[in-house]
Curated annotation (Swiss-Prot):
One of its GO terms (biological process) is lipoprotein transport. This is Outer-membrane lipoprotein carrier protein. One of its GO terms (cellular component) is outer membrane-bounded periplasmic space. NCBIfam families: lolA. Residues 1-17 form the signal peptide. Keywords: Chaperone, Periplasm, Protein transport, Signal, Transport. Participates in the translocation of lipoproteins from the inner membrane to the outer membrane. Only forms a complex with a lipoprotein if the residue after the N-terminal Cys is not an aspartate (The Asp acts as a targeting signal to indicate that the lipoprotein should stay in the inner membrane). SUPFAM superfamilies: Prokaryotic lipoproteins and lipoprotein localization factors (SSF89392). PANTHER family: OUTER-MEMBRANE LIPOPROTEIN CARRIER PROTEIN.
Length: 198
């Protein structure tokens, strides 16, 4: 009888775990990772608008480096306080605070451990896919779908814009490890315009 009661308690806790709690638990499985990705941007009708590739490094909490190599190179780096967006083609770097970035894109949620970050979102789960949607009063209008296994392995994510345009990112390699701290520093190259929005 005792075993049955314990089993029921365990099943109840599993059944009633919130999708947000489950996603947070999975994200907390590893402290960092490195991955290569492919990107495909689709129109609302499903036509391929763009394809690209790059690599990402995340060190939780708050550190990430997102490097898109093709079709147009750009780099997004944060040291946990400042986020730099560098576009070599236009020779410009934009700086903003990490909290500002969190309110503009749910991707930053992958890197943080701050419970209040989730206040602007609702989370739904379908297997290993978690749909992170902005609440009605949020300034964010895009939906974010992260695909993450119970082990914490992120296999990819998608961003669905309000107009139906979709960007799919699939991780072609994934290595759970702590990237070197030096990956999360950025030095503004000479001759580059600076747009400081902090």
């Amino acid at each position: 009888m005792k075993k049955i009661l314990l089993s029921l308690c365990f099943l109840s806790s599993v059944a009633f775990a919130s999708p947000q709690g489950e996603l947070t638990d999975r994200l907390n499985q590893n402290k960092g990772f490195e991955a290569s990705f492919t990107q495909k941007v689709l129109s609302p009708e499903g036509d391929v608008l763009m394809q690209g590739e790059g690599d990402v490094k995340i060190l939780r909490p708050n550190l990430f480096r997102w490097h898109t190599q093709t079709p147009d190179e750009n780099l997004l780096v944060t040291d946990g306080k400042t986020l730099w967006y560098y576009n070599p083609f236009v020779e410009q770097v934009t700086l903003m605070g990490l909290d500002q970035a969190t309110t503009q894109t749910p991707f930053v949620l992958l890197t943080r451990n701050k419970a209040s970050d989730w206040d602007n979102y609702s989370v739904a789960q379908n297997g290993d896919a978690f749909t992170v949607s902005p609440k009605s009063d949020s300034a964010i209008k895009s939906e974010f779908i992260v695909r993450i296994q119970p082990s914490g392995k992120v296999t990819g994510f998608s961003v669905v814009e309000q107009d139906g345009q979709r960007s799919d990112f699939n991780f072609t390699t994934f290595e759970a490890k702590k990237p070197a701290q030096s990956n999360f520093m950025f030095t503004v190259p000479d001759g580059v315009d600076i747009d400081d929005q902090r």
